[in-house]
């Protein structure tokens, strides 16, 4: 996959209990095609949380798709948008 075609998402760190791994919850909003109601969906991603950018619970982060790092991890943190209070 070319570097400029990698998917980027913004989400909130839910868990940092695993070593070098954070769980990020990404929320997406769309309009239902038949009922025209606004629907909210959530998805959790296992993200590489190691090195210079170490996120904590509650942080808002930007993640990017990368090569498989383990059985579940295919994302890494690009930047921390907002720290938890």
Swiss-Prot record:
The keyword Ribonucleoprotein applies. One of its GO terms (biological process) is translation. GO terms for cellular component: cytosolic small ribosomal subunit. Keywords: Ribonucleoprotein, Ribosomal protein, RNA-binding, rRNA-binding. InterPro entries: NA-bd_OB-fold (IPR012340), Ribosomal_uS17 (IPR000266), Ribosomal_uS17_bact/chlr (IPR019984), Ribosomal_uS17_CS (IPR019979). It comes from the Bacteria. One of its GO terms (molecular function) is rRNA binding. Belongs to the universal ribosomal protein uS17 family. NCBIfam families: PRK05610.1, uS17_bact. One of the primary rRNA binding proteins, it binds specifically to the 5'-end of 16S ribosomal RNA. Part of the 30S ribosomal subunit. This is Small ribosomal subunit protein uS17. It comes from Mycoplasma genitalium (strain ATCC 33530 / DSM 19775 / NCTC 10195 / G37) (Mycoplasmoides genitalium). The gene is rpsQ.
